């Protein structure tokens, strides 16, 4: 699960360089990564 989320975040960051990603999606994943780091 952690690997999938890492790949998903990596894809999200790489795609954000080409396409504008809604801030809602970015904030959503930021919260998830914060929860993962916290736990």
From Swiss-Prot:
Cell compartment(s), UniProt = Mitochondrion
Principal subcellular localisation of the protein: mitochondrion
Q: Which UniProt keywords apply?
A: Mitochondrion, Ribonucleoprotein, Ribosomal protein
Q: Name one GO cellular component term.
A: mitochondrion
Q: Is Mitochondrion among the key words of this record? A: yes
UniProt record similarity statement: Belongs to the universal ribosomal protein uL16 family.
Q: What is this protein called?
A: Large ribosomal subunit protein uL16m
Q: Which organism is it from?
A: Acanthamoeba polyphaga (Amoeba)
């Amino acid at each position: 699960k952690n690997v999938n989320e890492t790949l998903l975040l990596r894809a999200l960051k790489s795609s954000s360089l080409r396409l504008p990603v809604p801030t809602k999606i970015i904030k959503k994943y930021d919260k998830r990564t914060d929860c993962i780091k916290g736990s």
